Amino acid sequence: MKNYQLILLTTALFITLFYGESMGLNFGILAIGYALLTLYKTHEKYRNRNFLILFITTVLSGVAFAWYGDFISFLAVFVSAILLAFKSKSRDLKSLLAMPVFVVNLITFPYRFFKFEQWLPMRKSSVNFQKLISVVLIPAFFIIMFFAIYSAGSKHFAQIFTDFHFEFNFWEFFALGCLGFFIAFNYWNFKIDRYVFGWNHDLKNDFLNEDKNLKSTYSFLDLDAERMSGVVSLFALNVLLLVFIITFNYEQFVEIPKSPNKLSEETHNRVNAVIFSILMAIGMIIFYFKGSFNFDKNAKSLKILAKTWIVLNVVLVLSAFLKNAEYVISYGLTYKRLGVYAFLILSVIGLILTFIKVQKQKTNAFLFNQMFWYFYGVILVCSFVNWGGIITSHNMERKDFAVNFHRVSIHFSERQLLKYASEKGDEKLRDEILKEAKSKQAKSFLSKVIYDETIK
């Protein structure tokens, strides 16, 4: 199947799914349809392990959106589809390049659209295809367009067809056609220019032989002076961090407990400080081990201090993790506290990868290439799991459970709240939840969100 055929097919699918509908089950179906067509179209040589994993995650993301219909599942579909399209074109390019290439494709869309010779067939079309265009598609387009114009200009003309109860919103049809074509064109006509392969060279995970030659970074510092600056800096920072860890843990676990508001403020400030410290720590390692120091036999002290610096930062993260856990036990779960866990876990992963970078003599790009997949994994986990339900189930066990807060601010908590209402005999809460659920369940099939159908 050619690109232009896929563009027309998926544009028609988009219009069919979204005409007269709001976003819901239809978007999940669209995502799965794109994934299946991509699998069908992609040449066997590009169907490697990464491509097949991305195919599965794209389908699962589509299912997640059909189930929840929220922003994070939309983001999961968006990122998964871009990566799938990218890997269907090249198996060797780093996935980190997918987003920049996608943005370039969006910007250059007007130019690429008018390059008809690149995406429309230049040879003579088959007889059947010509008949389809000449007898069906072109006449149908003009009939629909002029029918809408004449109906708007004459009530009597429109009334001729009222017995058929035929309603047609031309502008919605036209807008959906344009949007569907824009999406389909940029997906199927996904172009990777030559300069991208130059970027890919800069994102290599391993050093080339010429990168291993010992040379100073700056002209005003020779190699010995630069090495010494690294040793002094990292030694001083290790001492400073060790003192900070001691005071940090004393303030968190030894001092007299404070009021909830004060404790909340201090906890968030400390976690922010930890995250910033981790970013700076990784930045320090990247700065000193960006090149020849990875292969400098005289840089053993520098490497030991760097690894010590990484280990101490892991200890700092674990301290913050324990404090956040204590905070959750004392005051319950929220989205923000779950977010803190996510950031701290990503921080530990980043530090472990930094340790591997130093130990295995990897490039700085190695860190970014690997962390990209972990961030993508976090998006997938956030989209697949009902975190609102987990938060509500956890907090329901508390004596100070705030029903209204979870009713308004925590998403997808209705099933847990119905259980709570049943246990407490709260008929008012039960009726409110069911009334809201019934209004959502009344939507047309393609506009439904599957989760709403489970609320009974």
Residue ranges and their predicted role:
Residues 1-3, 44-50, 116-129, 159, ...:
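Juxtamembrane membrane-water interface segments of multi-pass membrane proteins
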Residues 15-155, 176-198:
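Transmembrane-helix bundle segments that line or gate the permeation/cavity pathway
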Residues 145-160, 243-258, 318-325, 391-392:
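Membrane-helix interface motif
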Residues 163-176, 260-277, 334-344:
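Short aromatic-rich membrane-water interface segments that cap or initiate transmembrane helices
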Residues 308-357:
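Membrane-embedded alpha-helical segments of integral membrane proteins
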Residues 364-388:
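Internal/C-terminal transmembrane anchor helices
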Residues 380-404:
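Hydrophobic alpha-helical transmembrane segments in integral membrane proteins
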Residues 407-456:
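Extracytosolic and intramembrane catalytic regions of membrane-associated proteins
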